[in-house]
Amino acid sequence: MLRLRLIVLFIAVAAAAASARADQTDKRLDTLFAQLAAAKDALQGGSIAGKIWQIWLETQNGKAKKLLAEGIEEMDGEDYDAALRDFDKLVVLAPTFAEAWNRRATLLYLMDDLDGSVRDIERTLELEPRHFGALSGLGLIYMQLGKDEAALKAFKRALEINPYLSGAKQHIEALEKRLRNRAI
């Protein structure tokens, strides 16, 4: 019985230590990004990308974690005003937490505030230059604004980081075709 308690205690301490360091600065990300680049197929790549997202979503700040969870739930429920209030508080409370900026960027995009979304994506990328989700979002915004060359660049950067990023290849193909047709 004592041995079982020690094992449970060890697992709890290890999990707490992993969570305490989790965010875009987590050392596990370097290994995961290397594994993502070497993934053999989309299934393996998707699994690794999911682990990266899990780490990006972690924060050691309990209040920040609560605001993030509430903001995501409100955004998913299309209560955008409430989500914006929570994400605004979150980026003030945790200004170096990349996923806080990325989630607010996503919300601002959904609210048609493209300039605000781009600003938050830029901040996300300052904090985590490998954020393939933010790069993909930037590509979508640039496509919507008719900035095809900038969109193409963003999608290519995202795909370099995550070769299995859903939709990026199709967007690249469409943008390259559109740019070729313009050149004619």
Predicted regions and their residues:
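Bacterial N-terminal signal peptides
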Residues: 8-15
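Residue-level signature of tetratricopeptide-repeat
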Residues: 70, 104-105, 138, 145, ...
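Terminal, low-structured helical/coil segments at or just beyond the last alpha-helical repeat
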Residues: 27, 38, 47, 54-58, ...
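Register position in tetratricopeptide repeats
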Residues: 76, 110-111, 144-145, 174-181
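Alpha-helical adaptor scaffolds
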Residues: 64-133
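N-terminal leader/linker segments that initiate helical-solenoid repeat arrays
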Residues: 2, 18-69
